[in-house]
C-alpha cells in the first residue's frame, strides 16, 4: 500500500529544493542526512520549520528533501519555499495562512554582477585627488 505524498519545489538564490511530504511523525531528512546534522545553524532550522508551524503540521509529516546549489542560507530558504508549496498541494486552505506570512513568495533577490571598472558590484576604486 503506497502512502500518499505531496511534492513541492522551492528556490532561493542559486539553490533548488525538492520536497516530499508523507504522513508520519515529524522526521525530516535532507539529502539522506538528519536536518539538524545538515543545517547546523539554529536560524536555518527556524526558517525551515516556519511553514509547518504556521499551519500547525509540525509533527504530522515526514519530510524528505533533496537540495542542490548555493550555500546554507539559500538552501534553507529553498527548503522553506518547497515545504510551503507542498503544504498547499496537501490542503488548499493553507494557502491564505502561508501567503499572509509571505512563505509562498519566491525571494527574487540574487547576487548582483560585478561591473567593469569597479572593484565589486558597486564598490568603486579609491579616488585620489592628487
UniProtKB/Swiss-Prot annotation:
InterPro entries hit by this protein: Ribosomal_Su5_D2-typ_SF, Ribosomal_uS9, Ribosomal_uS9_bac/plastid, Ribosomal_uS9_CS, Ribsml_uS5_D2-typ_fold_subgr
GO cellular component: cytosolic small ribosomal subunit
GO BP annotations, alphabetical order: translation
Transmembrane segments: none
Swiss-Prot/TrEMBL keywords: Ribonucleoprotein, Ribosomal protein
Molecular function as annotated in GO: RNA binding; structural constituent of ribosome
UniProt record similarity statement: Belongs to the universal ribosomal protein uS9 family.
NCBIfam families to which the protein is assigned, alphabetical: PRK00132.1
Protein name per its UniProtKB record: Small ribosomal subunit protein uS9
Species of origin: Hydrogenovibrio crunogenus (strain DSM 25203 / XCL-2) (Thiomicrospira crunogena)
Gene that specifies this protein: rpsI
Amino acid at each position: 500500500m503506497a502512502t500518499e505524498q505531496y511534492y513541492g519545489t522551492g528556490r532561493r538564490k542559486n539553490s533548488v529544493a525538492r520536497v516530499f511530504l508523507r504522513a508520519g511523525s515529524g522526521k525530516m531528512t535532507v539529502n539522506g542526512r538528519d536536518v539538524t546534522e545538515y543545517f547546523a545553524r539554529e536560524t536555518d532550522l527556524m526558517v525551515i520549520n516556519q511553514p509547518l508551524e504556521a499551519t500547525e503540521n509540525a509533527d504530522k509529516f515526514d519530510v524528505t528533501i533533496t537540495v542542490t546549489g548555493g550555500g546554507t542560507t539559500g538552501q534553507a530558504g529553498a527548503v522553506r519555499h518547497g515545504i510551503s508549496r507542498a503544504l498547499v498541494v496537501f490542503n488548499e486552505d493553507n494557502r491564505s495562512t502561508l501567503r499572509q506570512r509571505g512563505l509562498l513568495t519566491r525571494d527574487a533577490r540574487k547576487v548582483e554582477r560585478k561591473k567593469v571598472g569597479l572593484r565589486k558590484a558597486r564598490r568603486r576604486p579609491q579616488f585620489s585627488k592628487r
